[in-house]
From Swiss-Prot:
One Pfam family of this chain: IncF
InterPro entries the UniProt entry points to: IncF
Organism name: Chlamydia trachomatis serovar D (strain ATCC VR-885 / DSM 19411 / UW-3/Cx)
The protein, known as: Inclusion membrane protein F
Lineage, broadest ranks: Bacteria, Pseudomonadati, Chlamydiota, Chlamydiia, Chlamydiales
Transmembrane segment boundaries: 39-59, 70-90
Length: 104
């Protein structure tokens, strides 16, 4: 990344306004898009694995399929659900990541 240059502009009222020069840097845009893509994937995994876990539990309670393989499926989808939830929780704790990518 290049150096950030701050340009000062004097307004009619005499106040000085500053503006950073590299606001539309390609690296910052790509970095922000990568972070958004990770969040979208984690959210999709959270929803899909949660739905699969619920459906597996319903099938297990109804007795529609053998218990062994279905119990493993429930355990793996629950683990994946918790992993995606952790990713989203960590991202939620760092709410300033969007603001840090665009410092205009």
């Amino acid at each position: 990344m290049g150096d950030v240059m701050i340009q000062s502009v004097k307004t009619e009222s005499g106040l000085v306004e500053g503006h950073r020069g590299i606001c539309d840097s390609l690296g910052r845009v790509v970095g922000a898009l990568a972070k958004v893509a990770k969040l979208v994937v984690a959210l999709a995994a959270l929803v899909l694995n949660g739905a699969l876990c619920v459906l597996s539990l319903v099938a297990l309670c109804v007795g529609a399929t053998p218990v062994g393989p279905l119990a493993v499926l429930v355990a793996t989808t629950l683990a994946s659900f918790l992993c995606a939830a952790c990713v989203l929780f960590i991202a939620a704790k760092d709410r300033g990541w969007i603001a840090s990518t665009n410092k205009c």
